[in-house]
């Protein structure tokens, strides 16, 4: 069985990690042992934050809808209850976008929610 020298594969592996660590500060960008830790931790943060991003955007949409709904005399929860009763199926992302960019359309939707709550 011939002897396998792993210089080529080790170099390729090091190069791959150091390429991912490009732009990092200090030893993290050019010392393999430190770069491995930094890249691994970055991957953990990325994995966690891809999930957190969904929660954070939903929270942002709710804040925007609540602020706009209060201009029309409704709280967020009353607005959503009214929309459910009126069978209006607009998701929070679209509602928040309307609240920011087209307040008149949002106002019409808010009036529908109010009417459904009164009925």
UniProtKB/Swiss-Prot annotation:
CDD domains associated with the record: Ribosomal_L20 (cd07026)
Similarity annotation: Belongs to the bacterial ribosomal protein bL20 family.
Pfam families named in the record: Ribosomal_L20
Matches recorded under PANTHER family: 39S RIBOSOMAL PROTEIN L20
GO molecular function list: rRNA binding; structural constituent of ribosome
Gene source species: Thioalkalivibrio sulfidiphilus (strain HL-EbGR7)
Keyword Repeat appears in the UniProt entry: no
Gene3D superfamilies xrefs: 6.10.160.10, Ribosomal protein L20
An annotated GO cellular component: ribonucleoprotein complex
Annotated InterPro entries: Ribosomal_bL20 (IPR005813), RIBOSOMAL_L20_CS (IPR049946), Ribosomal_protein_bL20_C (IPR035566)
Name assigned to this protein: Large ribosomal subunit protein bL20
Assigned keywords, A-Z: Ribonucleoprotein, Ribosomal protein, RNA-binding, rRNA-binding
UniProt function note: Binds directly to 23S ribosomal RNA and is necessary for the in vitro assembly process of the 50S ribosomal subunit. It is not involved in the protein synthesizing functions of that subunit.
Single GO biological process annotation from the record: ribosomal large subunit assembly
